[in-house]
Every structure is written in C-alpha cells, then in structure tokens.
C-alpha cells in the first residue's frame, strides 16, 4: 500500500505539469487585454503600454511561461494583477470559507442522501422508494443558481429568517450549503439505493436473516459495510466536485471564497490567480481520488494495491 501511495504521489508531477501548460495557454487565449482592463476605459495607449510592461505582458510568450513555471516550482505564483498582493495570500484568504462551505454541504448531503437511498432500497417499489427517488430526481434536475435564487427569495426576502450574503456566522452557511449540496444529496441517494439493492440480494444477507438477526442489524452491519465500497467512490468524486464546483453558488450568494475569486479573476483577466486556482483544484481532485483508493482497502481488506 505504501509503495502504491508513493507512486501515485510521484505521478502528481507530470500531471500538474501538463495542467500548468494547458492552463497557461488557455488564459492567454482569453479575449481581452488585462492591461487595458486594469488601466481603465479612459487610459490612453501610452498608459496601457506602461501597465503591460509593469505586468510583464510585453515579454515573449515563452519567456512568460518559463518565468511562471520556474516560480511555481518554488511555490511562488507571483502577484495578482489586480490587487498587487501575492497570489498565495489571495488564495489563502479565500480558501477556508470555501472549505467550510464544502464540508457543511457534504455532511448534510451524505447523511440525507444515504438515509434516503437506504430507505428506498429497503422499501423498494413502495411509497418510500418512490418519494425518495422523486425528490432525488428533482434535486438533480434543479439548477443550482435557480435553487439559490429561490431560497433567497423565500427565506431571506419574504420571510426574513436568514441572511443572504456574508460568511460571519453559522446562519450564513444554511442557504449556500443547501444550494450546493442539493445535487450531491440527490446523486448519493440514487447511488446508495442502487448499491443497496444489489447487496440486499446477496447470500450473506439471507444467511444473517435466517440466523434470526434483526432486519435493522442486518441492514446496518452486513449491508452498509458492503454497500459503502462503491458509495465511497462517489463521495470522493462529489467532494472534489463541491470544492471546484462552488463557483455558481458563491457568485449567487456573494460568498468570499475561491469560486467567486476565480470568477472575478476571469473577468479581470488576472492570469496569475486563474493559473494558481486551477492548479489547486487539479491537485485537490488528484489527492481526493488517492484518499478514496486508500479508503477502499480500509473498508474491504480483500482489496489490495500493488
């Protein structure tokens, strides 16, 4: 297992390099001139050219790429073109609000989704199953931005129960986490149901029932452990999706996180911030997949990696 983990970690190097190259080319193909956006609409050509020189945009593309890669290897992603603050500081300041929003969304989505999936599997083809799957399909079908606007209109504007923007208290997390986690809960419910339906028909489940074990204990002890193997994969992928896919939700709720920072950076063509954020999201996905593989072996000792 240790050798497998080390090999996967070493595999990060070429993967991140390829991502770095693609991101660099992508951001430089975006329409618009960062120097003109930063200088302002009333700036003349001389001022814009001066800004370009200050930002290093007057250098050849290959020179900019070498400067970017050589500094990134040392953990230096440069300065933000807009705020002139270190990119690492900008990301660090926005990371925790996004992380806590992701964790909050993931916790309730996993609890609700797995509970709904187990109930639907145990009472298959009956009204609990139909109700759970109807709610799940609705959760998947409803766009995040539309759900967010609906929740704001009902609970903030009409009822005045919850705040709309900010991240200062636990109340601020309720609406964004519900919006962000709705689709994940729906996916978890459907995936858990499918996995549990397969497990409930296995021989060891019938054997446990024949021995007089209560149905609740059969489901929780024998069914849950074996059904969790494919579900853990989905949990890992969904957690990565939440970390990198909170852009729309953060924009709707004006959340001070990485998603909104990325949107603002794209609008202003802030190349260093865009490159650093996408690299960070890529690293998160790779590490989450590695953790999922390790959890595989922890849940099912029969699984071994070489």
Swiss-Prot record:
The chain crosses the membrane at residues 9-29, 103-123, 135-155, 169-189, 229-249, 278-298. It is a multi-pass membrane protein. Keywords: Cell inner membrane, Cell membrane, Membrane, Transmembrane, Transmembrane helix, Transport. Residues 30-102, 156-168, 250-277 are periplasmic. GO terms for cellular component: plasma membrane. CDD domains: TM_PBP2. Residues 1-8, 124-134, 190-228, 299-306 are cytoplasmic. Part of the ABC transporter complex GsiABCD involved in glutathione import. Probably responsible for the translocation of the substrate across the membrane. This is Glutathione transport system permease protein GsiC. It comes from Escherichia coli O157:H7. The lineage of its organism: Bacteria, Pseudomonadati, Pseudomonadota, Gammaproteobacteria, Enterobacterales. The gene is gsiC.
């Amino acid at each position: 297992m240790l050798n497998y983990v080390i090999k996967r970690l070493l595999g990060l190097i070429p993967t991140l390099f390829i991502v770095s190259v693609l991101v660099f080319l992508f951001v430089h193909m975006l329409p618009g001139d960062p120097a003109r956006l930063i200088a302002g609409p009333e700036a003349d050509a001389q001022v814009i050219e001066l800004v370009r020189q200050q930002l290093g945009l007057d250098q050849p593309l290959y020179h900019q790429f070498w400067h970017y890669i050589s500094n990134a290897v040392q953990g230096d992603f440069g300065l933000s073109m807009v705020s002139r603050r270190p990119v690492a500081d900008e990301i660090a300041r926005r990371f925790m609000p996004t992380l806590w929003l992701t964790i909050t969304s993931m916790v309730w989505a996993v609890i609700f989704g797995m509970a709904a999936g187990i109930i639907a599997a145990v009472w298959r083809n009956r009204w609990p199953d139909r109700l759970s799957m109807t709610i799940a399909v609705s959760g998947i079908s409803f766009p995040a931005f539309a759900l967010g606007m609906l929740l704001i209109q009902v609970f903030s504007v009409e009822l005045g129960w919850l705040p709309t923007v900010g991240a200062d208290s636990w109340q601020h997390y309720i609406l964004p986490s519900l919006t962000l986690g709705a689709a994940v809960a729906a996916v978890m419910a459907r995936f858990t149901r499918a996995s549990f339906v397969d497990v409930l028909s296995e021989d060891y489940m019938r054997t446990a029932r024949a021995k007089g074990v209560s149905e609740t204990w059969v489901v929780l002890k024998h069914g849950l452990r074996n059904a969790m193997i494919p579900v853990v994969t989905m949990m890992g992928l969904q957690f990565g999706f939440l970390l990198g896919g909170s852009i729309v939700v953060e924009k709707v709720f004006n959340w001070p996180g990485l998603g909104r920072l990325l949107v603002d950076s794209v609008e202003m063509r802030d190349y260093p911030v865009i490159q650093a954020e996408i690299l960070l999201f890529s690293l998160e996905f790779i590490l989450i997949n590695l953790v999922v593989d390790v959890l595989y072996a922890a849940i099912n000792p029969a699984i071994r990696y070489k």
